[in-house]
Amino acid sequence: DANFMIERGQKIAFVGKNGEGKSTMVKCIMQEIEHNGTLTLGHNVMIGYFAQNQASLLDEELTVFQTIDDIAQGDIRTKIKDMLGAFMFGGEASLKKVKVLSGGERTRLALLKLLLEPVNLLILDEPTNHLDVDAKEELKRALKAYKGSILFVCHEPEFYEGLATDVWDCSQWTTRIL
């Protein structure tokens, strides 16, 4: 059994070894796995979810710029080029088609797209997979600046230290899907 509450602005890292139930818990929260538990969301909670396969769900026929332009709203629209540059898609890189991007580039693009969505709770399942050191640092900076709450699965202390307000070690969990 798990019973927890995520407070506004809290940034929680689920840490532990492979196979300890971190991603399973996330999949239960996201209703991707049947279970007997309940999830109660607070008033006006909007979840943005980054699954481990999120980068593969991007439209391969769009360019990097089009992918972000499609989701950006309001004041963000005037900052698209700056945001693309911050995620290492400046200049010509923003004109590349998604289908020619590397795994790390796709992951960066999928994460940037998620950060632009009008959500206030991010649930990220191993968001640093396929990212190089510079991309991880940029993601960490963006998540630190994010005003909403974050629950993320991570294996890398150098990433979650200084980002997470709380670190939940999953090594003592017993994860059973009933």
Language model: regions and residue ranges:
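ABC ATP-binding cassette signature C-motif
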Residues: 1-178
